[in-house]
Every structure is written in C-alpha cells, then in structure tokens.
Amino acid sequence: MESTTLSKPFKNQVNPWGPLIVLLILGGVNPVTLGNSPHQVFNLTWEVTNGDRETVWAITGNHPLWTWWPDLTPDLCMLALHGPSYWGLEYRAPFSPPPGPPCCSGSSDSTPGCSRDCEEPLTSYTPRCNTAWNRLKLSKVTHAHNGGFYVCPGPHRPRWARSCGGPESFYCASWGCETTGRASWKPSSSWDYITVSNNLTSDQATPVCKGNEWCNSLTIRFTSFGKQATSWVTGHWWGLRLYVSGHDPGLIFGIRLKITDSGPRVPIGPNPVLSDRRPPSRPRPTRSPPPSNSTPTETPLTLPEPPPAGVENRLLNLVKGAYQALNLTSPDKTQECWLCLVSGPPYYEGVAVLGTYSNHTSAPANCSVASQHKLTLSEVTGQGLCIGAVPKTHQVLCNTTQKTSDGSYYLAAPTGTTWACSTGLTPCISTTILDLTTDYCVLVELWPRVTYHSPSYVYHQFERRAKYKREPVSLTLALLLGGLTMGGIAAGVGTGTTALVATQQFQQLQAAMHDDLKEVEKSITNLEKSLTSLSEVVLQNRRGLDLLFLKEGGLCAALKEECCFYADHTGLVRDSMAKLRERLSQRQKLFESQQGWFEGLFNKSPWFTTLISTIMGPLIILLLILLFGPCILNRLVQFIKDRISVVQALVLTQQYHQLKTIEDCKSRE
C-alpha cells in the first residue's frame, strides 16, 4: 500500500454495516430487462477489460439472462496491457502473443536473442511481463507464502469505503479495502461481487512460463451477491496490487456483460401461408403453425407399420414421450406437474443446433420416402449448422454455413435431429438436389409444442382465487430440453444402464413425434387435389377438435386454450380430469379446515354474502335508532317541557303586572 503510517495486515477488516449497505444499493438498481420472457436465450459474452476499458479476455455462450456465471480465467499480464510501465506491456495490444525472448543466459556468456535477466531479482520496478523469465518470477511472487496479491472493489463499494481512494491508488489507498485475493492474511468479504485466486499452481505455471506463454492465469468467480446484481452490462471495476516489499505495484481491471439477441424466430418450409399468419405487430414474431394432426396412429418402436390408432392414443403417446424425456433430464420438475397440448398452432418447434452429420455415397435407410415430411416448421430458434445457399432472411439461424462439394452423396442428420429445409423436414439431404435447386437446410432438434405448468398455477386457475397482474410465462419442452440432443441424450450418456435408459426414453419421444407427423403427412397427401396451402392450414387447425374430444372424454383438463395432463413420478395420469377434481377437492378441504366458522359460513353460502351486504346498512341504522332513540326522545321532551314552562311563567308574570297597575290607579283615586 502507499500509506506509510499503516502496517500490512494479517486479516481483512470488514465493516459490519457492509452487507446492509450493499443490499440497499442493489435494491435501488433497475435491472436490465430484455424481452418479456425470462427464459429467452441470448448470446452472452463476459468480457474482462484492462484499465483503458479494452477487452483483453472474453468467453461467449447462449443462455437465458442472469443464469450463466462461468469462471473467468484471464492472465494477470493481460490485465496489465497498456498499464503502468513497471509491467512492461504499456505498448502491447490486446490479444497479442506474449513478448519474448523465450530463453535466457547468465551474466557471463550471452546468447543472441536471449534475455539476460534470468538471475536478476524481481524488484518493485522490474518489468514483470515483458519476458518469459520475468513472468516466471511474477508467478513465484503470486504463489509465495509471504507474497501474493490482493484486490479492492471500485465504485460499486459501499459508502463507508470512500477512504479506499480511486483509480490512482487502484482503489486500495488504505488497509481494509481489500475484499479478495491470494495473500497470507486471506482477504475476504461478505458483500463483494467476485473472488480472485490463482488458476495454476506454481509447479504448473513453471513449464508454461518457460514455453513463452501467458502463465499467470487467474480464476475469477462470481459470489452470491455478484449473481444477484443485474448491472453487469455497464460493468464493474477493481484494483489489483501485488504484495511485495516496498511499493505495491498495481493495475485496474473490469468485468462487463455483453448481451446480444440470439435472433428472431424464423419459419422454414414450403408453405408461405403459414409464415404470414403471425401478427406483424408483435415485437417477437408469434408462432405460426407447423404440423398437426387429423388421422391417428399408435407409437410402437419396433413395428415398421404400426396399426392405425385413435386420436387418444396418438396424442397421449406424444405427451408420454415428452414426460419421459423431461423426467430423465429434470426429475425435480416431474414430481408433480401438468403437461399441456396447445389447441392453436404451432404444434412443433425447432431448435437449431451444431452437429456432425454423416456422409454417405448411397442413400441410408433413414432416407426412405416414409420419413420425409413436406411440412412447414414455422418456428426455429437458436443458431446451428446450415447447408446450401441460405438467404439473408434466414442467415440469423446459422452459426456455421457449409458449402457442398462436387459429387452425389447424402448427408444424414445425427440421431435425434433432422434437417429443416425450404422444401420440408427430412432426416437426410441429397447434395445433387441442393446443386440443382436453391434449397437450403438447417440442422434442428424437433420438439412437440408441449407446455409445462406447475400444479399451483393450474389449481389457482380453476379456483379463481389468484389474480395475476401479468400472465406467467409458459415453459415449453423446447425451452426445457432444447440442445440436449447434441449434449448426449441421443448418443447415450457414458456407458451402461444410464445410457440405455436415456436412449430408449428419448427414442420413445422421437417415435411418437414421427407417428404424429406421419399421420399429418398422410392427410395432406389425401388433400393434395385442393389448394396445398389452404389444406395444410385447415388440417393443422383440426388439432383443436382432437383436443376437444380428449376433454369431453375426461382424459385432459381444459385450461384456457390448452389440454392438460397430470403427471408425477409414477407417470402420466390417464384420467386427468378426475385427478384435477380430486386435487381441487383436497385443496378445498384443506382451505376450509384452516378457516374459522365465520369465514366458512360465507364461503359455503355465496348468496349469504350478498344478502348481508344488502341489509347491513338498514340494520345498523335501525340498531342505532333503538339504542339512542329513547335517550334523544327524552331529551327532546324535556327540552319542550322546559320551553313550555318558561312561556307559562312569562304569561303569569305579564298578568301579575297588569293587576298591580289597576290596583295602583284605584288607590290614587
């Protein structure tokens, strides 16, 4: 530290009011709100900056807001780029390779191109990052028991820390300002946003330094307070100082979050009518219709031609497959829940993914005609692998675009994925067709439009007790499971029983979706003599009639425009309406048991509430009259009597004076 009156501490000085002050500060910050749904996926980039606010290290991922808190591992010397001269990097640009030379020689004999500072001590003003051997010495200092470094927070610190100074003192003007670091007294804090430590041990850093690489990697982790903060877009700043004898050299670094929208939801398919059905006034396009159903089929996994089944079996199998996949990946969400099929389009949605497709010189088995679906996938999100000449309107879906080479071969999508092309859905594509046409394809995961609701939300809707200022966000299967296909479910997680169960359960969902899509395709084929676009629109709207039959049969509970099925860890309940009545009855009994007799009287007799509210006013007035009327009447009578007596007295007095006057006159005569 720069202060000469204070000795170096052995423990951190913590202000007891610090947590309260920080809570008040955080409570006054307006969070960044991008979009209406908290589940919308954004392209997030965590950036670490130097003192000039230049990005020197970054990490990127696609996640919902405020859910991704990765470890940040920049190098200490990267933070010193364009920093003070004693770091030796004042003229180095960000992301430039580490300066050399990578070798050294002693003071006696020299080697051309080698540094001569191998045996020289690392003093307070020795450039610490300009050579491989100085970076090695810096590593020894940061790992030493009596050395290390400490970090002090910048402007986001509480008010009591104003004495910690500004950037000129690296926010560490006095002891007690440090909140984290790697030092002998183990500085810590209960309110700061991050912790900083060494990422490599001294033994791990030595060969990296000798190889002329950045070898002083740090590990920056977000604390619980940091994860609650929503002001990372503007950034926060810290000062870092080395703990050495004499003057403690330092630097300034910052952390900020860059948020980019993952892109609009774009329809892909041959039917332009479906694309135009979304309301143009919405900021994010609403979901247009993909496949639906009309004619049904069952979902056996082994039979190539399953016998036709009713609407009940086909849609129930679709919900069962969704439940099994969700129960496998997130068993905590299936302890008790409601899975709902929507009555309005879209009924399927795609998530663009990156994957490794297989190249075949001859058509593989899954390229059969039966697996082709000339349907429009009206909503695709994310960014994935694209093949062909993708127009500018759909390039937002492409993370990587590959051109096909000359030749005739087939590109098969990985297990659990499919190609969403401008001509429809297909498990494999022919490069010959791509060369002859302007077709293009995006690798997607296909998910049925199944919404997830918590039991409390469903019960409140039927009890009409809860009033929501804003409609709760509906979680769909694509939001809950999107991206997991390429993450291991389809291929199997490891080996053994877990992988087998994962593969089987995911295949059941795939089989149910394939059966549903196949029935839709058959119906469209039968209607091809009429207008294709109109046929598909009318056909997909038939899903509402199918769900109506399920509701009338008591198989599902109608919630607004959805048909909901109850599920728990025992599986999907077939008679969901009976289950709903049972749960509502249990909740009603529990609610009544917690009420007093007076509240229960009003709840059991709704008409009684209206009657009481109507006659309560007149009854209260009548009661007041009966209570205070006699007293008021007595006082009124008494008042009247008093007035009458006064009048009588005045009359008598007047008569007396008249008699007296007459007598006086007679006596004088």
Swiss-Prot record:
Lipidation (S-palmitoyl cysteine): C631
Sequence motif YXXL motif, residues: 656-659
GO molecular-function terms, A-Z: metal ion binding
Span of the annotated motif CXXC: 337-340
Region of interest (Receptor-binding domain (RBD)), ranges: 32-267
Function: The surface protein (SU) attaches the virus to the host cell by binding to its receptor. This interaction triggers the refolding of the transmembrane protein (TM) and is thought to activate its fusogenic potential by unmasking its fusion peptide. Fusion occurs at the host cell plasma membrane. The transmembrane protein (TM) acts as a class I viral fusion protein. Under the current model, the protein has at least 3 conformational states: pre-fusion native state, pre-hairpin intermediate state, and post-fusion hairpin state. During viral and target cell membrane fusion, the coiled coil regions (heptad repeats) assume a trimer-of-hairpins structure, positioning the fusion peptide in close proximity to the C-terminal region of the ectodomain. The formation of this structure appears to drive apposition and subsequent fusion of viral and target cell membranes.
Disulfide bonds: C77-C129, C103-C118, C104-C114, C152-C172, C164-C177, C209-C215, C337-C340, C337-C564, C367-C421, C386-C398, C428-C441, C556-C563
CDD domains: HTLV-1-like_HR1-HR2
Organism classification: Viruses, Riboviria, Pararnavirae, Artverviricota, Revtraviricetes
Leader sequence segment: 1-31
Stretches in topological domain Extracellular: 32-611
A GO BP annotation: fusion of virus membrane with host plasma membrane
Keyword Kinase appears in the UniProt entry: no
Gene that encodes it: env
Region (Disordered): 266-310
Domain notes from UniProt: The YXXL motif is involved in determining the exact site of viral release at the surface of infected mononuclear cells and promotes endocytosis.
Name under which the protein is recorded: Envelope glycoprotein
Subunit and partners: The mature envelope protein (Env) consists of a trimer of SU-TM heterodimers attached by a labile interchain disulfide bond.
One GO cellular component, as annotated: viral envelope
Keywords, sorted A to Z: Cleavage on pair of basic residues, Coiled coil, Disulfide bond, Fusion of virus membrane with host cell membrane, Fusion of virus membrane with host membrane, Glycoprotein, Host cell membrane, Host membrane, Host-virus interaction, Lipoprotein, Membrane, Metal-binding, Palmitate, Signal, Transmembrane, Transmembrane helix, Viral attachment to host cell, Viral envelope protein, Viral penetration into host cytoplasm, Virion, Virus entry into host cell, Zinc
Region entry Fusion peptide, spans: 473-493
Cytoplasmic topological intervals: 633-669
Glycosylation sites: N43, N199, N293, N327, N359, N366, N399
Site (Cleavage): R470, E471, L650, V651
Source organism per UniProt: AKV murine leukemia virus
Binding site for Zn(2+): D117
Motif (CX6CC): 556-564
